[in-house]
């Protein structure tokens, strides 16, 4: 997908596709119960950045005030720098930008995504997905996750467990998870 900072990259087509029933039905038709294909079969063109060092918290108080907060230093010990005035470890979120490189002869790894190349003032893509769910203007849930590339799938699975499988909040979070991102072409099972 050609996702990037919308102040620098036109993401209207990607967003339109992500919200399109026809696009989703087209992807669904490509799913084969017996085989996973290369990423380009599903429309994947670019490599994904793997990040670490993330925490998430979700809070809803007795008055229905809500917070969904994801924080990251990205890699272990972030930028390896500590602020002398605050003692806070600084993040290295700059590592989430795609880095231009020469063409690779390795056909199993897609090239970096140009929409996520670094530019002054630009924000890198991130898998952080702090989410507040509302219905008719009222808070129904607060959800998010940590785990780098597992964040989006984890957040989605907790959401589905709670709203569609009718699990309680703790069971929704503790339930085993399945993860597949096409590269590497391996299914991960977490329990």
Swiss-Prot record:
<feature type="binding site">
    <location>
        <position position="93"/>
    </location>
    <ligand>
        <name>L-glutamate</name>
    </ligand>
</feature>
<dbReference type="Pfam" id="PF01019">
    <property type="entry name" value="G_glu_transpept"/>
</dbReference>
<protein>
    <recommendedName>
        <fullName>Putative inactive glutathione hydrolase 4</fullName>
    </recommendedName>
</protein>
<feature type="binding site">
    <location>
        <begin position="126"/>
        <end position="127"/>
    </location>
    <ligand>
        <name>L-glutamate</name>
    </ligand>
</feature>
<feature type="active site" description="Nucleophile">
    <location>
        <position position="54"/>
    </location>
</feature>
<feature type="binding site">
    <location>
        <position position="74"/>
    </location>
    <ligand>
        <name>L-glutamate</name>
    </ligand>
</feature>
<dbReference type="InterPro" id="IPR000101">
    <property type="entry name" value="GGT_peptidase"/>
</dbReference>
<feature type="binding site">
    <location>
        <begin position="147"/>
        <end position="148"/>
    </location>
    <ligand>
        <name>L-glutamate</name>
    </ligand>
</feature>
<dbReference type="InterPro" id="IPR043137">
    <property type="entry name" value="GGT_ssub"/>
</dbReference>
<dbReference type="GO" id="GO:0036374">
    <property type="term" value="F:glutathione hydrolase activity"/>
</dbReference>
<dbReference type="InterPro" id="IPR043138">
    <property type="entry name" value="GGT_lsub_C"/>
</dbReference>
<feature type="binding site">
    <location>
        <position position="72"/>
    </location>
    <ligand>
        <name>L-glutamate</name>
    </ligand>
</feature>
<comment type="similarity">
    <text>Belongs to the gamma-glutamyltransferase family.</text>
</comment>
<dbReference type="InterPro" id="IPR029055">
    <property type="entry name" value="Ntn_hydrolases_N"/>
</dbReference>
<dbReference type="GO" id="GO:0006751">
    <property type="term" value="P:glutathione catabolic process"/>
</dbReference>
<feature type="binding site">
    <location>
        <position position="96"/>
    </location>
    <ligand>
        <name>L-glutamate</name>
    </ligand>
</feature>
């Amino acid at each position: 997908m050609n996702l990037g900072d919308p102040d620098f990259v036109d993401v209207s087509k990607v967003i339109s596709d992500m919200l399109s029933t026809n696009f989703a039905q087209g992807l669904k038709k490509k799913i084969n119960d017996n085989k996973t294909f290369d990423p380009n079969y599903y429309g994947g063109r670019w490599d994904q950045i793997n990040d670490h060092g993330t925490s998430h918290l979700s809070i809803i108080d007795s008055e229905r005030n809500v917070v969904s907060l994801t924080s990251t230093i990205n890699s272990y010990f972030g930028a390896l720098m500590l602020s002398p005035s605050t003692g806070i470890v600084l993040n290295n979120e700059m590592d989430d930008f795609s880095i231009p490189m020469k063409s690779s002869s390795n056909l199993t790894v897609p090239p970096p995504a140009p929409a996520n190349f670094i530019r002054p003032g630009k924000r890198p893509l991130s898998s952080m997905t702090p989410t507040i769910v509302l219905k008719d203007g009222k808070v129904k849930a607060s959800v998010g996750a940590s785990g780098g590339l597992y964040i989006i799938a984890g957040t989605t699975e907790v959401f589905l467990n709670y709203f569609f499988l009718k699990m309680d909040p703790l069971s929704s979070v503790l339930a085993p998870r399945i993860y597949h991102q096409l590269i590497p072409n391996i299914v991960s099972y977490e329990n």
